[in-house]
Amino acid sequence: MWRCVSRGFRAPASKTSSLFDGVSGSRFSRFFSTGSTDTRSSYTIVDHTYDAVVVGAGGAGLRAAIGLSEHGFNTACITKLFPTRSHTVAAQGGINAALGNMSEDDWRWHMYDTVKGSDWLGDQDAIQYMCREAPKAVIELENYGLPFSRTEEGKIYQRAFGGQSLDFGKGGQAYRCACAADRTGHALLHTLYGQAMKHNTQFFVEYFALDLLMASDGSCQGVIALNMEDGTLHRFRSSQTILATGGYGRAYFSATSAHTCTGDGNAMVARAGLPLQDLEFVQFHPTGIYGAGCLITEGSRGEGGILRNSEGERFMERYAPTAKDLASRDVVSRSMTMEIREGRGVGPHKDHIYLHLNHLPPEVLKERLPGISETAAIFAGVDVTKEPIPVLPTVHYNMGGIPTNYHGEVVTIKGDDPDAVIPGLMAAGEAACASVHGANRLGANSLLDIVVFGRACANRVAEISKPGEKQKPLEKDAGEKTIAWLDRLRNSNGSLPTSTIRLNMQRIMQNNAAVFRTQETLEEGCQLIDKAWESFGDVQVKDRSMIWNSDLIETLELENLLINASITMHSAEARKESRGAHAREDFTKREDGEWMKHTLGYWEDEKVRLDYRPVHMDTLDDEIDTFPPKARVY
């Protein structure tokens, strides 16, 4: 049975309680055998009421929580990790903003580069908002205490990054990336956590969010989460729920992502019957360490690093004559892959490329790239002052995610409206798809994305609601299906360990949805990923406890990954063109007439259904005109 404990914060918590006696009819009832005739289980349910709930405590989640607290909202932040272990900590290169500290710059030039980088799949209203707000966001971080690297004059140091230019692509390389050496994400996350602690944000650390609590009218009323420490279940009722749960890089075998990047928020949205957008666009970072997958920042090339093949040739001069090694990431990753395919890879198996930093002055490496020097020594056994680093394109970022407008509000198609807002639900950061990155993200736009749109979510909440507003009670059966499903999953007695299914999924994604794709590999991938999902019905969870059950948590994460992976593969198979990170060998050209539109992937009855919505080509106002599509050359 349920034992329901009500806790009131600001507004009285819902007094609704229900009984759970092996609830039948759960979503996955056909999947999981409990191996017992008595399916009754006892779960303690704790109810909370907040003005706003943020799920995730990385850069986007913390910035949203800070903003909400500043506006006076009673805010909870739920996170499965201690906040400073969130994956923002791994970001290295920096944060883009047209500060003009190294040369003249303009946010409009930054916007042009971002639209071009997105291969014209980015929404230009959202891109305008992000780039225009960028200088303000960086100065705000400086005021929070972020220890940026400095020029001799004391200004924030800015380095060159890929795909960035002056004067709408006509003025040469831009120096737009503000950084804290090569540990910018670490500095940012700790700075924001300090600010969040200063405000009255209530943190629920090591709570695993399970599902959204959706009302019958289609609005979101909060989330249900599992406290991993004691096994209690918590229903968080709120006027606004902000998902900042990061990407799902761990759907692939080799990724720069932490093992916690499992697309939990995306899957929660998909299970609620809402779409995910543009998941086929997965960024491969050009320089992951060969064999280990650890990231070597693009800043290493921004500081003068050079990619060379087995012949010692600086081959990027052939593929991107102007930008060379600082072309956009999808361009560099494809170029490296082609060099390897054509037999000019390095190493005994000729299956990777060398990144040379050994021509740079040691003092530059020590001051600007200290983390890279350490990472290369540990994971590649390389002294960067003397030897090149072996690198290979590695899964790094998900351009797709939960579709939102530039306020951070989650949107879907309703009737003739492709931008219908879901009341009470927002998203920010890598989990969201605003879409400011379109088909390919520019380096150093992700840290910008998380702080600009985390703040935008908080500001939008302040515009549409007030602290302490009365909330509707939760629906009588709120969370019931989730608890039934959790119980069956915890007691599942199949034959396949979680790790076996996960490894199979990762190999399918790595082999069939990689840098280059064909109809054959994608069709095979769709069949294989569907079978991988079916195999999840035979999953085995050995640990039956509710306290620190890592077996159960990894299985929950695997389900989330499988949903993301399935929508990714089916979306990629359907898109018959090459655009940004989605490179088809059988459809090599960008087809704006038919395919300049966002893919929407729905998870319905454990199958993927696809739909489409238009790209926002219009800008917010007359400050800048729309950038019409043209050939993307670097």
From Swiss-Prot:
InterPro entries in alphabetical order: FAD-dep_OxRdtase_2_FAD-bd, FAD/NAD-bd_sf, FRD_SDH_FAD_BS, Fum_R/Succ_DH_flav-like_C_sf, Fum_Rdtase/Succ_DH_flav-like_C, SdhA/FrdA/AprA, Succ_DH/fumarate_Rdtase_cat_sf, Succ_DH_flav_su_fwd
| PTM sites of type Tele-8alpha-FAD histidine | H87
Q: What class of enzyme is it?
A: oxidoreductase
GO MF? ATP binding; cobalt ion binding; flavin adenine dinucleotide binding; succinate dehydrogenase (quinone) activity; succinate dehydrogenase activity
Active site residues of this protein:
R329
Any idea of its EC number? Answer: 1.3.5.1
Give the pathway annotation: Carbohydrate metabolism; tricarboxylic acid cycle; fumarate from succinate (eukaryal route): step 1/1
| Keyword Transit peptide attached | yes
Q: Where is the transit peptide?
A: 1-32
Q: Where does FAD bind?
A: 56-61, 79-94, 264, 430, 446-447
Q: Where in the cell is it found?
A: Mitochondrion inner membrane
For this entry, the protein name equals Succinate dehydrogenase [ubiquinone] flavoprotein subunit 1, mitochondrial
